[in-house]
């Protein structure tokens, strides 16, 4: 055992319902094992690391770390910073001209006396951590980097279940449980529920499934119009599945004629290629973030789907609602807390043996929970549309399963 003297924690990327709980779990576990180990938390992710801006974890914080399980977001703050995007780091004032952000980060860790860095984030955060770990190893810094996999998209290779995704699906379902009643407000209403998920439909599919569980647990009174058919999910559209717009419009028009409303769940990554092609044809700029990803909130897939379907199904009013920020900022649910604690416990164990990697259930190694080697971590894992529960759900709502589509990341 090679006990660390000082560890650092940072959270980065977009929010997910696990960040606060993961911070709390790491602080709790280190305190249980050896409270003499110093802990700091970098403020606003890699930004704080580059600027040397951190919180010291005091005895009071250790005593009250359990409070973090009750909150969403990240109390220590996030940012989207790519250490290998030198131009962006300079533009944002995080490093000076001529500086290498990776070296600045590495030197700051040494200056702060950090032995182990815990990064909590998605594929971008952990690929950034992988780059940093490789830089540290190549230049003999002797620091250990251990990642925890956060993403509501559940799209990280080769990790079976990323932290926060279960909660996000549950919260998205609860969000739509309120929104759906808007169909009462107008005849022939089309409600489009846009769910987060860049190039992965897992969250959209899982949210629809969780929402239908809520419907299963409800009592109905169709005699006065309280009919499950009107509250039902009528269509689920994900990037990995081909969409026959004409056939779906015909099917959904029949639903509209029968129940006076249509409710569809759309992944924010569905139809993006078509939307981007439209924008470029019009000479419009496609906005991207520091990692080169298209800014999906600017592209607005839900609006596009609404426009495509509205006329074809005879909708009098179209309502587009996005559950993403509501879902991703939630506190962790019981299932996620259990997963987070098991991952955090192993992360601390790995810290004591100085084993770098990303903690997760390794799909290529029998789903064993382990520190997965950084070079094997990558984003863009597609949702398997042949997953039995998804196939059953499509059959249950009367939607034909489209052909598989290869998605780019």
From Swiss-Prot:
It comes from the Bacteria. It holds the Pfam family PFK. GO terms for molecular function: 6-phosphofructokinase activity; diphosphate-fructose-6-phosphate 1-phosphotransferase activity; metal ion binding. Its main location: cytoplasm. It is found in: Cytoplasm. Diphosphate binds at residue 14. The record marks 150 as: Important for catalytic activity. This is Pyrophosphate--fructose 6-phosphate 1-phosphotransferase.
